[in-house]
Amino acid sequence: LRRVQPGAFTGSAVESVTLFDNLQQISDYAFENCTYLRTLHINAATAPVYSGSYYATFADRYDRLLSLESTQKLVLFSGSSARFGYDSAALDAALPSYAVVNMGVFAYTNALPQLELIRARMREGDILLLSPEFDAAKRQFCTTNAFDDDFFCMAEANYDMVAELDLQQYSGVFSALGSYLQTRAGMTQSSYAVSPSDLDEDGNAVDTPSYNAYGDYVLYRSDAADDTPIYGLPVDYTTAAFPYDT
């Protein structure tokens, strides 16, 4: 199967769809008015392209979360503010009754599906600590239910995560998948054997792991030369300063 045409399943009673990541074309128009469709299974038919990148850390983090499902835990979440900003070992030492997992990867993808995956693995007494990023407020505060291709980038190392989400709670799923597949088709293939901890943030091989078991990026990163906002945004953290288009 290479293409799923617009209207292919319009109005059908399909409940679950299984696709492969060598698909070339698909969009939401193929599944309009499919009110029973809840589950998307994706199987890997091609080599990964995001192995070694920060996207691929999400699957590792999720594996740790799964391993702690029955354990009282502290879950750290956001984008790179969590990935770079926490010392999970220090939190672990200060809160010995909680196991720590750092789920933060990338602020510029919708937090909603990530938080739904996390919520399903949390139990009474667990703690979720958010550190939302100012310039990605719309995505970080779940103001939309729309999927984006970056989420699929993060799911590439474990497509089974996608199948855990109820598609009726989201919009734009298949169009985002189509965008993701078109982009990766033109990228250099890698291998699942390549771990993000083998590389630094710029893709260079490192002698010591760049990520620890908690999910923290632990290589030294120098401070910025000044406090000028990277995206040119004011940093007074008032409601007037929040960008309307993020």
Show the residue positions of the predicted features:
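Acidic/glycine-enriched edge-of-secondary-structure segments
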Residues: 47-53, 99-104, 241-245
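Membrane-embedded segments
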Residues: 76-165
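Secreted/periplasmic serine-hydrolase-like ester/acetyl group-modifying domain
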Residues: 146-246
